[in-house]
Amino acid sequence: MSKSKGNTVDPESYFATHGADALRLYILFMAPPSDGVEWNDGGIEGTKRFLNKFWENIETLSKLKELDGSNNETNIVRKVNQSINSVSNHLNKFEFNTAVSDLMKINNDLSKFLKNNEDISKESKDMIIRNLCTLLFPMAPHITSEVFEEYFNEDLINTAWPQVDTKNLKDPTYELVIQINGKKRHTRQTDIGLEQSEVEEICKVEFNMNLSDYKKIIYIPDKIINFVG
């Protein structure tokens, strides 16, 4: 975009229709600062949807039943920690577009967690909300400040930048047992937390299994997948 070429965008109209956070986020997400870009209204719609989903996820998470000793959240807590690491690195290098991309990814991961879980420890709930709001704050200060103050009754601007837990960065693996009609045929070292569709894809690609040959597929997460013919 260039004023001399007459193809600039008036921000005032987008403030009114999409909000300042969505506009700021889209500008940062469009491309690296050194690159020229073509404005796309569909792109700002995408960042607005992301912010709406972020708000919805935090609200849903805040209402999740708190259960001491719950270990349901091990994987999502690790993913948040990985996001602290990646977003911090990208911001330090002024790679704003990839920082936004990482935040969109962790927001999708949180959506999956909320879809499949009904409880969480208070410690993990607080950790996730505090860190995700803090990571997104430089790029979307209005929505994150409001969400943060509503949950913690604190000002987000006074919150320290999150620190990476270096011991909780690497995804642990387990030995997946692949059975056919209840008999073990293969094993594979696999990341924990994979969904059934992801495990089926591994079996199809790596072990040349034709999934349509089987009448039923039984999947026990992080343990066994059994193909019944």
What are the residue ranges of the model-derived segments?
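Generic structural signal for well-ordered beta-strand positions
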Residues: 1-2, 185
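An acidic, gly/pro-interrupted, aromatic-rich
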Residues: 2, 8, 30-34
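Residue-level structural signal for beta-strand termini and adjacent loop
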Residues: 4-7, 189-191
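Short solvent-exposed loop/turn micro-motifs enriched in small/polar/acidic residues
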Residues: 7, 169-171, 210-211
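A short local loop/turn or secondary-structure capping micro-motif enriched for an aromatic residue
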Residues: 10-11, 165-166, 194-196
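Helix-rich, typically C-terminal accessory recognition domains appended to large enzymatic cores
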Residues: 13-189, 218-221
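NTP/phosphate- and nucleic-acid-binding module
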Residues: 66, 176-229
